[in-house]
Amino acid sequence: MLKEYEDSLYNASLVDGRVELLYIDEEPEVEEEAVIVEVEPAADSVATPTDADAVAKLMNGERADLVFTDPPYGMNLDTDYSSMQSKLAIADEKHLKGGNKYDAGHVDDFTPDMVQAVLNLDAKETFIWGADYFAELIPNRNDGSFIVWDKRANESGTIEQDESSDKMFGSCFELCWSKAKHKRDIARVKWAGIFGMEQEPDRKRVHPTQKPIALVAWFLNRYGKEGDIVVDLFGGSGSTMIACEQLGRKCRMMELDPHYCTVIIARWEKLTGQKAIKLNP
């Protein structure tokens, strides 16, 4: 099932200002049933975010301080890798289907109840990626603000002209909606799109819309504090959990797809050297 990751899964995390590669050398066993896994001080759940009981079980009576999430809009992408096959050895065929072009606006798989599930957490700070594609689904969206992620610039603001994949696939920036009315800001985190971060080797990624851990760290450091309970109801690649582990936050994460929930757990285990504990559903 995880044949796409036969060489090893990876991501980069920010450790003392440097990038550390995280490798997963073996294929983890996929958990098909809904479970909650304790990866102290975090929790990872295979369940749907629209199930209020499942979310309540995940939170275990605690309240979210900050929500950072990237909902599954556009997962049925219409994508053609034919011109880049020499660079893209293997695509995640489960979620990236062959076609003509990348269509980030394809949001058939995203529904209003998913947005409401995030807002129901009632966190002081809530950040939702891709909301510019489904803004009409967000109630009172004008009460919030948008933050720009500039993928081409480093922290000093210098734009580096290179051959990053986002010149061919996707865009050089993304927008994140904030529930709070923050001042206009730009997260400058260098990213080479589908090929990974500049510091990473040209390897396969673990998720089609994966966010770099350095980007998650940018938000957690600016809008949160150590010890915060951070919630991500659409865990995806698990970058939010890894950033929380690095920065002393408590993560509560949910992922609908058992495949990616397994990847998240494997990444956490590789980073910490600890073993996740499966709790009763």
List where the protein language model places each region.
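Class I S-adenosyl-L-methionine
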Residues: 43-46, 53-69, 73, 77-101, ...
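A short, well-structured juxtamembrane/interface segment
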Residues: 106-117
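SAM-dependent nucleic-acid methyltransferase catalytic core
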Residues: 1-8, 13-68, 278-281
